Amino acid sequence: MENEFTKVMSERTNEDLIKIVTVEREKYNPTAIEAADLEVEKRKINISEFEKIKEKAIVEKKQKQKVDSNIVGSGVRFLNFLIDTIVWFTLAFIISFLIGFIIQPTDEGIITLIGYIIIFGTFIAYHIIMEIRFQKTIGKFVTKTKVVKLNGEKPTDGDITTRTFCRLIPFDRISFLFVKNGIHDFLSKTKVIKENIS
């Protein structure tokens, strides 16, 4: 018997349908589930393929639940921010001092330009190098937290680079005070979790 979800379910992949009728069943209304069940029946999906996809979906769901239960709160995120800001400014100060000592610029415009380059360069380099190499910054070392992808896996270099440049968005630095994941987490599809899990 067809319903308003029949066409939608007929356009789903076998994997999508199996997830819908098994591990994601509670997310859908009964009419959608009925359409998905009928589509699975209609396609005559091989039982071993069905079970394989179902098991994979169960493992993924458990991993996501484990990651979600270990997301750190705003207080820890704020502490990470404070520690990392101190480290970043300390690095920028040291680099500025060394560069100023070596080249000794006299033009105010050049001094300002060099200052901006050092501040932004240090910020970007600090976060990218630390999070690519260790999945964490100094602040996260102190709080025993780390950056992961939404499924708990280690982020790619691209994920970390995206995450770092998204930190430059105005108000991003305080967005984690209002939501569990900040803007840079949302856009880079990452999370900060307690270090004790994958």
Question: Where would I find each of the regions flagged by the language model?
Answer:
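Membrane-interfacial and juxtamembrane segments of integral membrane proteins
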Residues: 2-198
